[in-house]
Regions:
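Structural signature of multi-pass, alpha-helical inner-membrane proteins
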Residues: 2-6, 27-178
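Sec-dependent bacterial lipoprotein signal peptides
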Residues: 1-25
């Protein structure tokens, strides 16, 4: 009989532990989940037989095909922060990179004058959905670590992207400090 009581007590503990995640999740349903986003900055490249480049379509209203290196040169891991800024005729995105990102931005902009950076972004509830946001022309060496461009998105989408990318950047830097 005593064995049954002990087994019943363990069963109740296991049952409580099994139900705990569901109870915690139901308590958090009122909280808004933090948005995250992803950023990939690629560099324009010539088509190659080795398969290291690919053509992408940038801009939705008047699509332009740009051939890029498949591997991004910069990501959200290189960011310090992003913000939406006022620009002539609307708004632009300003991406401020860390020391390594600043160095990469300077090296690639100096070596690829006359070509394009191609920016890909993902944001929102289904981050798997994303698109090519811009292909800013490289007209000079960028030594200050700041890339500014006009994105192919609405102001609301830009605000969501910036909030998500800043949250992702904060999470990355928090993980690096641990």
């Amino acid at each position: 009989m005593r064995t049954m009581k002990v087994l019943a007590r363990y069963f109740n503990i296991y049952l409580a532990l099994a139900l705990l995640p569901g109870l915690v999740a139901s308590c958090e349903t009122g909280k808004k989940k933090a948005q995250t986003a992803a950023l990939r900055v690629h560099i324009e490249a010539l088509p190659d037989a080795a398969g290291t480049s690919q053509p992408v379509s940038v801009l939705r209203s008047e699509p332009v095909l740009v051939n890029i290196k498949k591997e991004p040169i910069l990501t959200e891991a290189n960011l310090i922060n992003a913000k939406v800024i006022e620009a002539r005729g609307g708004f632009a995105l300003e991406l401020r990179f860390d020391e390594n990102g600043t160095w990469l931005l300077e090296q690639y902009s100096a070596a690829n004058n006359g070509q394009h950076f191609v920016v890909f972004g993902q944001w929102g509830e289904k981050r798997s959905e994303g698109r090519w946001l811009a292909a800013p022309f490289i007209s000079r060496r960028i030594s200050n670590g700041i890339l500014v461009f006009t994105p192919d998105c609405s102001r609301e989408e830009a605000d969501q992207f910036v909030a998500g990318i800043n949250e992702a950047t904060k999470q990355i830097h928090k993980g690096l400090l641990k």
